[in-house]
Amino acid sequence: NPVVRITNGAIRGQN
């Protein structure tokens, strides 16, 4: 689930 990882990082704070 690469999309989930990218979305999670962006929502978290652009990790």
Swiss-Prot record:
Coarse class of the protein's main subcellular location: cytoplasm
Recorded superkingdom: Eukaryota
One Gene Ontology cellular component term attached to this UniProt record is: cytoplasm
Compartments (UniProt record): Cytoplasm
Q: Catalysed reaction(s)?
A: a carboxylic ester + H2O = an alcohol + a carboxylate + H(+)
Sorted keywords for this record are:
Cytoplasm, Hydrolase, Serine esterase
What does the record give as EC number?
3.1.1.1
Keyword Cytoplasm belongs to the record:
yes
UniProt GO MF annotations:
carboxylesterase activity
Q: Family assignment?
A: Belongs to the type-B carboxylesterase/lipase family.
Please give the name of this protein.
Esterase 56 kDa subunit
What's the source species' lineage?
Eukaryota, Metazoa, Ecdysozoa, Arthropoda, Hexapoda
